[in-house]
């Protein structure tokens, strides 16, 4: 069926998924709360865009211009993000349907609910300054992978050419989409091999399968190389991942240990960002794929079936391998997609005995519901945590601003320096994520030169609340920092002083 008929057939399911996605994310996305980095979009938009260009992320700037959302508007951003997340689920599941030819209502629900409820997606939702653009990129990668698949299958060159702009914009927006494209490509070959090649009467040769892989590779590497060349010629290289790469900083053995440790954490689900059912899904996938290979042992190219299964496991850990250890959580966007895909694929397997088929079906349903419920619990707790954090940040910021105004000269505005940090006072029901739960007044306090970058962030946040402060330069920060050792910590008397023409606010003691 074509795309319009696909939408029509599952319109009730998509409406339910839209409501579910709103439940997961609307309380955060549709609020006016400000998180880390978002204050820069409000207080220093041009500086933020320049920073994106300097770190090789021009795609975000292009998309903001294209979507006409270059200023902070949480309501347009929130509605747009929810829409594009649901649209990405529609596009990906339609791609899977076109490859397998199998209608899969339970798979659609499992894929979409697990993906929407995933805590890694929630961590990315926290960054409102870019979240709608990244949701658009999920859609762009789905379209790019679909067009690449059509090129690999039909050999029609224009499909490959059309895939390039979609891939390039996504790759130029966030480096994690390289991994997502690769996993999407491997997922396509997995579906094509296990649910098309093995089941068709036509005996597809190993040579044909290798050419399918080759044409897919041309699409990926073409987009990747164009993006790399464009970045080097017109923008600066990104240091986003460079700071996380441990190869060369630690021994090879230590890096291999770090990689294995992270893989084990994901498989066992030992923290809130890694689902406890990930390993179960993968083992089930291996079991049923092995059964298919044994059942169709007369087919050629069986070794490719084994290879694609190995790649399906390794692809989510591409960033882990590149970094030589666990990358930041928000860059692991491929993991929610991987888990969702495995949940979808489980419903595609068929067993001849009806009784066993029913057991498989209901096992998939139970596992999907269990996974969604576990993820949803943490996602909603992260929503609540951020709400409490922002209330604390806003109240504290207004109190500090009132104290600064009492020191500020009416005729002259002095630059402001913040020393130390002030953590949010969260309650016992809150949970800390990687960034969620941490105060804007207590971020970057350990980054050298200490006091400078944290001051820029705090001043940016206060300016987003309506203040008109300026921050001191790095040299001035170091000078006044040496003179504030005897100052008390805010909110004590004497915690805000005018020192050498600079207002110094001591929030806490600096760590050595």
Language-model segments: residues:
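Intrinsically disordered, polar/acidic, low-complexity terminal segments
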Residues: 2-54, 58-59, 64, 68-108, ...
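Transmembrane catalytic cores of multi-pass membrane glycosyltransferases
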Residues: 24-81, 85, 89, 110-112, ...
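Alpha-helical transmembrane segments of multi-pass membrane proteins
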Residues: 86, 135-146, 163, 220, ...
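Alpha-helical transmembrane segments
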Residues: 93, 288-293, 345-349
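Transmembrane-helix signature of polytopic, membrane-embedded enzymes
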Residues: 96-120, 139, 157-158
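Membrane-interface transmembrane helices that cradle and orient dolichyl/undecaprenyl
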Residues: 141-159, 194-200
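Hydrophobic/aromatic-rich transmembrane helices and adjacent perimembrane loops
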Residues: 319, 324-351
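Signature aromatic-anchored transmembrane alpha helix within multi-pass, membrane-resident enzymes
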Residues: 349-379
């Amino acid at each position: 069926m074509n795309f319009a008929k696909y939408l029509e057939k599952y319109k009730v399911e998509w409406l339910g998924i839209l409501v579910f996605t709103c439940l997961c994310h609307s309380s955060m996305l549709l609020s006016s709360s400000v998180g880390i980095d978002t204050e820069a979009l409000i207080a220093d938009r041009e500086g933020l865009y320049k920073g994106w260009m300097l770190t090789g992320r021009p795609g975000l700037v292009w998309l903001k211009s294209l979507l006409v959302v270059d200023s902070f508007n949480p309501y347009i951003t929130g509605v747009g993000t929810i829409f594009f997340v649901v649209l990405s689920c529609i596009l990906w599941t339609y791609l899977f349907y076109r490859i397998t030819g199998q209608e899969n209502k339970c798979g659609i629900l499992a894929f979409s609910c697990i993906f929407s409820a995933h805590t890694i997606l929630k961590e990315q939702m926290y960054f409102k300054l870019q979240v709608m653009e990244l949701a658009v990129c999920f859609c762009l990668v789905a379209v790019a992978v679909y067009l690449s698949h059509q090129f690999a299958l039909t050999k029609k060159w224009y499909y490959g050419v059309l895939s390039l702009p979609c891939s390039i914009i996504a790759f130029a927006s966030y480096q994690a989409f390289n991994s997502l494209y690769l996993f999407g490509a491997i997922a396509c070959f997995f579906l094509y091999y296990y649910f098309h090649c093995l089941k068709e009467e036509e005996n597809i040769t190993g040579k044909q399968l290798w050419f399918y892989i080759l044409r897919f590779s041309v699409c990926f590497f073409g987009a990747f190389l164009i993006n790399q060349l464009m970045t080097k010629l017109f923008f600066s290289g990104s240091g986003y991942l460079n700071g996380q790469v441990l190869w060369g900083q630690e021994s090879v053995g230590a890096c291999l240990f770090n990689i294995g440790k992270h893989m084990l954490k994901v498989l066992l689900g030992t923290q809130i960002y890694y689902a406890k059912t990930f390993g179960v899904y993968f083992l089930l996938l291996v079991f049923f794929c092995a059964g298919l290979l044994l059942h169709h042992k007369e087919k050629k190219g069986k070794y490719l079936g084994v290879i694609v299964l190995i790649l399906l496991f390794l692809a989510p850990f591409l960033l882990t391998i590149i970094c030589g250890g666990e990358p930041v959580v928000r860059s692991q966007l491929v993991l929610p997609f991987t888990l969702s895909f495995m949940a979808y694929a489980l419903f595609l397997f068929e067993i001849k005995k009806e009784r066993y088929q029913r057991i498989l079906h209901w096992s998939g349903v139970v596992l999907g519901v269990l996974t969604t419920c576990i993820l949803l619990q943490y996602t909603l707790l992260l929503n609540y945590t951020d709400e409490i954090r922002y209330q604390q940040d806003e109240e504290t910021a207004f109190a500090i601003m009132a104290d600064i105004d009492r020191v500020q000269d009416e005729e002259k505005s002095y630059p402001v320096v913040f020393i130390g940090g002030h953590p949010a006072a969260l309650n016992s029901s809150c949970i800390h994520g990687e960034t969620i739960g941490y105060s804007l007044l207590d971020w970057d306090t350990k980054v050298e030169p200490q006091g400078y970058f944290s001051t820029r962030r705090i001043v940016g946040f206060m300016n987003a609340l309506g203040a008109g402060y300026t921050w001191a330069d790095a040299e001035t920060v170091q000078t006044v920092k040496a003179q504030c050792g005897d100052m008390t910590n805010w909110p004590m008397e004497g915690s805000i002083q005018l020192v050498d023409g600079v207002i110094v606010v001591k929030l806490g003691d600096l760590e050595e």
